[in-house]
Amino acid sequence: MGLSFKNNVNKISIESNRLFHAKNKNLEKVFDKFIVSAKKRAQSNIQQNKSVDNGDLRNSLKVTRKKNKNIKQWKLIVNSVHGAFVEFGTRKRANPPSSLTSYANTFRGMKGESGDVVKRLTDYFKRKGFSEDGIGSAIMDVLKNGTKPHPFFFPAVWYSQRRLPRSIRKALKKKR
C-alpha cells in the first residue's frame, strides 16, 4: 500500500496508489475531508491573525484533486507571492518554527511582488486607518525590521494531520 504526504509553505499534497484505494473506497472521502478542513482552518487562521487586507491571501488557497489510473492526488496550494512572508515573517522579525527553519530560510532575500513597495505600504497603512503622520514611520519600521509572522498554513495542516490517522482507521473498518 502506498500513501505519501508532502508539504512546504505553499502546498500540501497527499498521494495514494491504486492498491491503497482498492482496500477501501472510503479513504477517498477521508482525504477529501482532510484537505478541505485544512483549507478552511487556514482561511480561519488568516482571519484570526488579522492577516486579511483585501483577501488576496485567503482567496489564493486552492484545493486540487487529480485522479488517474494508478494514483490519486490531493493538493492544498497557497497561490500567493506573499504567503511565505505572512507565514514566517520578514527580516529581523522572522520567527519560523524550529522544524521549519531551514525551509523558511529558502525565502530569505526573495523579492515579493514587483512594483513600488513604498506605495503599496502607504496604501495598506491608509486602508488600516493610520494617520498621514504615522504612515512614514510605520513604513520605515517595516523596511528596517520586517513584519511579524502570522502563521496560517502549517498550523492548519498540523491540526488536520493529527486527526487523520483516526479517520483512516475508521474508514478502513467500514465495509466497502
What name fits each language-model region?
Residues M1-R176:
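Short, Lys/Arg-rich flexible segments
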